[in-house]
């Protein structure tokens, strides 16, 4: 058997390492970029054939090709493989095919999925279960096959689900869906269909927890699993309370809107799995939210600073704005072909001043109209401008609405840079 790897990112690296231990086969790695010396040494030591700097028709000789999730469907090699009837799969699909589905909890959504996944892992672990945290969240799922776990809590991206041919999940949570990654997917419909692929594979006895406001899920005819919506009269959250199965519980802290939605969604999932919520609320007290997600940094001269660098879509930005009355908003990064006219219409009542830099400024600028705004060159200038146009009591919010890759390695580096500038200006950290 000959197994190919199209792209050699984190997930395919982990899969190859697993297969080298557990499967007799010939392996072939095809990477568009240049491989580093350490990677080449590893491949050569294990007699793995490889090519770099582009893809060739050698992949056609493989019985199955595992696709790195980030590779776009319209790349020429994908089109060639598809036209020749090649079998395409993913590291995620390999994992799902080799594990008890009842132990897997899959979580997806446009915004909040990393936090929700981390929260579910936290409450399961603290309850005494051996829980694996991974998927799109850090560790590739296939690495869990080397151990024994009670639960596998996986964050799942639209890219992973798109390339996985049959991602069956016994427990599936969908937080929300809005326009995102339209620079990757051919349409919003394709993006939604990718996110929801597991729903239509579920059978009786499986669990599906979902946001009632997702338009595509208004008609669930043909879905055979147990369907539990939230943001309903039975399951919803206020600033201070959590209502699950119609029963009221006091939230153990003050949470911004997106975190409240995460807590609500995971609490409904937890209730359906364990039929009680008291232990969840106790364990929630000790959960530390992930950085760069509505992270309160502190004050400078009475101004309040929030780092929401993980907000890479306009839907996420609107969620952040919903927590405040008026905001000095910093947006930056690479946009995702969203409806910016609609975004500005919804955001404008919350904006005291909009500061933009990076590629997204070109896409936003035509729609800002009479909203006070500034276009600057970088984060330092954005920070200085925010101080200039704000006054004591104002909120200064970094919520970019775009991917970080035009100027930063990732969203975390972008958020850390914002925090560094905050400290440099004498920020009074919490």
UniProtKB/Swiss-Prot annotation:
Which coarse location class describes where this protein primarily resides?
cytoplasm
For this protein, the Enzyme Commission number is: 6.3.2.9
Please give a single GO biological process term from the UniProt record: peptidoglycan biosynthetic process
Q: Which residues bind ATP?
A: 109-115
Reaction catalysis annotation? UDP-N-acetyl-alpha-D-muramoyl-L-alanine + D-glutamate + ATP = UDP-N-acetyl-alpha-D-muramoyl-L-alanyl-D-glutamate + ADP + phosphate + H(+)
Which residues belong to the signal peptide in this entry? none
Q: Pathway it acts in?
A: Cell wall biogenesis; peptidoglycan biosynthesis
Which key words tag this protein in UniProt?
ATP-binding, Cell cycle, Cell division, Cell shape, Cell wall biogenesis/degradation, Cytoplasm, Ligase, Nucleotide-binding, Peptidoglycan synthesis
Where is this protein localized, as stated in its record? Cytoplasm
Q: Has the keyword Nucleotide-binding been applied to this entry?
A: yes
Entry's transmembrane regions: none
Paired cysteines (S-S): none
Please give the HAMAP family that the UniProt record associates with this protein.
MurD
What is the role of this chain? Cell wall formation. Catalyzes the addition of glutamate to the nucleotide precursor UDP-N-acetylmuramoyl-L-alanine (UMA).
Q: Which family does it belong to?
A: Belongs to the MurCDEF family.
The entry's protein name is UDP-N-acetylmuramoylalanine--D-glutamate ligase
- Please name the source species: Thermotoga petrophila (strain ATCC BAA-488 / DSM 13995 / JCM 10881 / RKU-1)
The UniProt gene name for this protein comes to murD
